[in-house]
């Protein structure tokens, strides 16, 4: 048994949202009780104590859309590439990288992503992977890294026809095999969706194969209308809009399916998303960085669509994404009073509701029976801090880098900015060698 206390406790439980000197009692994989530190210490005198040292104690965060394959791209410049539009960004950088990823490259990307996520207080990742240099077994390799380090993960492989029929078939098979394996485990730490890249790189025939292989086992995780090219492809080649196309194919939209980006959609398409219970995930920084537009999240909320928040691997800091979401929505809508409730709902409520479709234990909340995913942030405010203004401090005062300790599924995996029972230096050294190998292949030089 463990007590995490001596800090400001944010529970995200509407019945008991905030305790000034709070504590969380953890037993096994679950939260057993929350209360004041004095109460919990008196009730459980023999419990191990994790001292928050006056910081902020809060539920671990969920990143609802990321890409492990980008894990070795930080600092990389590919010679001769100066991408002028979204398609060139994909062709010059991301598809170029994933074509060069072997199994070791994928493993190194997974280490980089998982370690940095945990450092930033992220306890659950929802990943959409691609490594067309080597496909079979990649999701199992990523799963092994997630289990080794201790992060909670929902994984899929992005099916795409961009590298030919053999790679397309392998990517479908990788999804199907991993989804069946994950379903058989009955393990809240690892789950699966069935991935697809985007409509403009997947034919109807391939979508039908994906639906058949999935056979209703899990939901789909697909990019939709991230760029206008996706819309034009559907209109020119299929005589309908992207969501109409998915609806006609059948078996894809639904309550366990999540669509990435969803920037260039019509009102009718949004109505279909709502009617089918399909989820969307917004990635504000990535959309701005790729210059593809701003997702109509306010309209989605007005229609009652379940919208989550991800990063698209632009960052692993969810609080950073929350800040940027607020700024871009206000800028885009030219209204300084919008986006606050939507952004905080996406990150702190909707991401957890999304994972509730794949995880039996409640996430994103510190209450009896919830998963013991807890973080401690070094944050000592110089203005009043209470349940009335928690999110104001989150948006304007806190960052992922404030995170000092991360507990996942009841285990301390990162304490006082050091990983527990993990040789981080050895992992970093090996990952560095893999990144040098990848960069060398991309730039035809030695690093």
Regions found by a protein language model. Give the residues of each.
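His/Asp/Glu-enriched, well-ordered alpha-helical/loop segment
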Residues: 248-252, 296-381, 395-399
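Active-site microenvironment of metallo-dependent hydrolases
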Residues: 1-22, 27-32, 37, 43, ...
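Alpha-helical scaffold segments that flank or form the walls of functional sites
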Residues: 76-128, 133-151, 173-185, 432-437, ...
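Active-site gating loops and adjacent loop-to-helix segments of metal-dependent hydrolytic enzymes
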Residues: 72-106, 163-164, 228-254, 276-279, ...
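Metal-coordinating catalytic core of metallo-dependent amide/deamination hydrolases
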Residues: 129, 134-264
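Glycine-enriched alpha-helix->loop->beta-strand junction motifs that scaffold or abut catalytic
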Residues: 150, 214-219, 251-255, 272-281, ...
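Divalent metal-coordination and catalytic microenvironments
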Residues: 7, 24, 29, 54, ...
């Amino acid at each position: 048994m463990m007590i995490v206390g001596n800090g400001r406790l944010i529970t995200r439980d509407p019945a008991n949202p905030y305790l000034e000197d709070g504590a969380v009692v953890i037993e096994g994989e679950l939260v057993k009780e929350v209360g004041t530190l004095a109460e919990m210490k008196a009730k459980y005198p023999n419990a191990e104590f994790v001292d928050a040292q006056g910081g902020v104690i809060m539920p671990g965060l969920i990143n609802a859309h990321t890409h492990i394959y980008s894990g070795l791209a930080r600092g990389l410049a590919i010679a001769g590439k100066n991408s002028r539009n979204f398609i060139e960004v994909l062709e010059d950088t991301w598809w170029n990288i994933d074509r060069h990823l072997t199994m070791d490259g994928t493993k190194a990307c997974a280490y980089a992503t998982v370690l940095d996520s945990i450092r930033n207080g992220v306890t659950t990742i929802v990943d959409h992977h691609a490594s067309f240099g080597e496909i079979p077994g990649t999701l199992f390799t990523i799963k092994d890294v997630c289990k080794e380090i201790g992060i909670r993960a929902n994984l899929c492989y992005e099916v795409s026809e961009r590298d030919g029929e053999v790679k397309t078939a392998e990517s479908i098979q990788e999804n199907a095999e991993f989804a069946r394996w994950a379903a058989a485990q009955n393990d809240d730490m690892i789950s699966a969706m069935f991935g697809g890249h985007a409509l403009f790189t997947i034919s109807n025939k391939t979508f039908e194969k994906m639906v058949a292989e999935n056979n209703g086992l899990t939901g789909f995780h697909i990019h939709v209308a991230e760029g206008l090219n996706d819309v034009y492809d559907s209109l020119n080649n299929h005589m309908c809009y992207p969501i109409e196309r998915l609806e006609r194919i059948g078996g894809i939209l639904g309550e366990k399916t999540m669509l990435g980006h969803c920037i260039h959609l019509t009102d009718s398409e949004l109505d279909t998303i709502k009617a089918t219970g399909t989820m969307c995930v917004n990635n504000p920084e990535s959309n701005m960085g790729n210059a593809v537009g701003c997702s109509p999240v306010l309209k989605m909320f007005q229609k009652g669509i379940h919208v989550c928040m991800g990063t698209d691997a632009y960052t692993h800091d969810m609080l950073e994404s929350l800040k940027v979401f607020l700024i871009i929505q206000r800028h885009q809508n030219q209204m300084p009073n919008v986006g606050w409730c939507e952004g905080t709902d996406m990150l702190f409520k909707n991401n957890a509701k999304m994972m509730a479709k794949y995880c039996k234990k409640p996430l994103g909340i510190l209450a009896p029976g919830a998963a013991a995913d807890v973080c401690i942030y070094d944050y000592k405010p110089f203005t009043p801090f209470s349940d009335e203004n928690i999110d104001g401090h989150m948006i304007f005062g806190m960052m992922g880098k404030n995170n000092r300790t991360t507990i996942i599924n009841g285990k301390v995996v990162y304490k006082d900015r050091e990983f527990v029972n993990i040789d981080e230096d050895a992992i970093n050294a090996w990952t560095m060698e893999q990144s040098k190998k990848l960069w060398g292949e991309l730039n035809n030089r030695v690093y």
